[in-house]
């Protein structure tokens, strides 16, 4: 059996990074182009587009693509796509730049000032941000939901069109062993003889329930390999830095998994906290990375109490035949059971809640930050030792993230103007 095809009608990876002389020539040309400044999420989307993880997208969405994605989960050609990938600009910046439809522009990361891509603007359009929030995030609560807050903080206009990606960022230097493009993970899987790979999405150090989910998948008989795939894009307050988390993953993989059945990789996307919709996005690009299954457990990609614990599982049931080649591996509540003397789930354990230790990522981080002594059922000692060392020197931050924490003063002003 072969690996699943990349997503989209052409069934081939479509990386957008230029290389060699073409790249150098485009960088030189970009110096004379009008500049459009990007948020950290837009910059991370450039990296995902560049490596081919967002295949079959050729750039930032035009209005028809945005509308189909938001309201129907489809691009105009019928390809399933669950979340917007858009570039916005304020009315003031648009007027000052003189940019028009047909213009070529240089895309600059607002924080670093670095050039990341060039873009041909095929369309300048406005969107209904309230409709996007309600359709994609199922809420318009900009004060509590970080994805909604960022939606309302976007500029008044979107720019749609193809890009030429020029800057691969610095993740290669930070994670030289694990920062892999879809073509590279596919080659890795093939070298191991894997064709039925399951992906595990994580932005936290892995506690015992996480470990159990991956092992449960490996023991299911449906898969021949697993990839722990960690997000290392921009973090929010209370999150543990990627470098520390990677040390935790290494300790877990080295001590508790057979290396012939496990792979570890990282990717640069910024979390959207889209719950069910984001679970579908995770599935799309995991298919591009070569995976046939995605573990979808409790509250996948959620935040707060905006989604039911298993909404991210049931949304896959709403898809039409052929929407994805990847399938969800749906797993119920997992916990440590003292009577079973092992990790278990509602499918395997008959005992009551008084016998169970249910571990959540928030509980795990808060206990570590406060220096609380954790029972062995929470995490492996090698992982806990790394985290204890990190928290001894880390600045104390509030674990619960406010939706506005990543936003600039200009973005906050837009929200306070009335969610325009």
From Swiss-Prot:
This is Sulfate adenylyltransferase. NCBIfam families: PRK04149.1, sopT. Keywords: ATP-binding, Nucleotide-binding, Nucleotidyltransferase, Transferase. PANTHER family: PTHR43509, SULFATE ADENYLYLTRANSFERASE (PTHR43509:SF1). Pathway: Sulfur metabolism; hydrogen sulfide biosynthesis; sulfite from sulfate: step 1/3. It catalyses: sulfate + ATP + H(+) = adenosine 5'-phosphosulfate + diphosphate. Gene3D superfamilies: HUPs, Sulfate adenylyltransferase. It is an enzyme of class 2 (transferase). It holds the Pfam family PUA_2. The keyword Signal does not apply. The lineage of its organism: Bacteria, Bacillati, Bacillota, Clostridia, Thermoanaerobacterales. GO terms for molecular function: ATP binding; sulfate adenylyltransferase (ATP) activity. Its EC number is 2.7.7.4.
């Amino acid at each position: 059996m072969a690996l699943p095809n990349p997503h989209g009608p052409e069934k081939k990876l479509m990386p957008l990074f230029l290389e060699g002389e073409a790249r150098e020539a485009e960088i030189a040309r970009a110096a004379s182009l009008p500049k459009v400044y990007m948020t950290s999420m837009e910059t991370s989307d450039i990296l995902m587009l560049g490596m081919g993880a967002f295949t079959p997208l050729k750039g930032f969405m035009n209005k028809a693509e945005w509308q189909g994605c938001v309201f129907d989960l489809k691009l105009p050609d019928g390809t399933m796509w669950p979340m917007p990938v858009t570039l916005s600009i304020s009315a003031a910046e648009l007027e000052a730049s003189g940019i028009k439809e047909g213009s070529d522009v240089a895309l600059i990361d607002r924080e670093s000032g670095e050039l990341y891509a060039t873009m041909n603007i095929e369309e300048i359009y406005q969107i209904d941000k309230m409709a996007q929030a309600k359709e994609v995030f199922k809420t318009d609560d900009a004060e509590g939901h970080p994805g909604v807050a960022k939606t309302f903080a976007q500029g008044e206009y979107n720019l749609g069109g193809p890009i030429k990606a020029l800057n691969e960022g610095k993740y290669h230097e930070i994670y030289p062993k694990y920062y892999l493009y879809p073509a590279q993970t596919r080659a890795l899987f093939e070298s191991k003889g894997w064709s039925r790979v399951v992906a595990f999405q994580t932005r936290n150090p892995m506690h015992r329930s996480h470990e159990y989910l991956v092992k449960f998948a490996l023991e299911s008989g449906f898969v021949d390999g697993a990839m722990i795939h960690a997000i290392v894009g921009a973090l929010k307050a209370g999150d543990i830095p990627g470098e520390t988390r990677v040390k935790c993953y290494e300790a877990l993989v080295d001590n508790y998994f057979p290396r012939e059945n496990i792979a570890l990789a990282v990717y640069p996307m910024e979390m959207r906290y889209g719950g069910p919709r984001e679970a579908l996005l995770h599935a799309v690009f995991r298919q591009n990375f070569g995976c046939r299954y995605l573990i979808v457990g409790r509250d996948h990609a959620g935040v707060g109490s905006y989604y039911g614990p298993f909404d991210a599982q049931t949304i896959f049931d709403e898809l039409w035949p052929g929407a994805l080649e990847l399938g969800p591996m749906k797993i119920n509540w997992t916990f440590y059971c003292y009577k079973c003397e092992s990790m278990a789930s509602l499918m395997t354990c008959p005992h009551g809640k008084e016998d169970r230790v249910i571990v959540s990522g928030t509980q795990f981080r808060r206990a570590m930050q406060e220096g609380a002594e954790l029972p062995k059922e929470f995490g492996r000692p090698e992982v806990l030792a790394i985290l204890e060392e990190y928290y001894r020197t880390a600045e104390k931050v509030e674990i619960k993230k406010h939706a506005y924490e990543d936003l600039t003063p200009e973005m906050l002003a837009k929200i306070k103007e009335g969610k325009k």
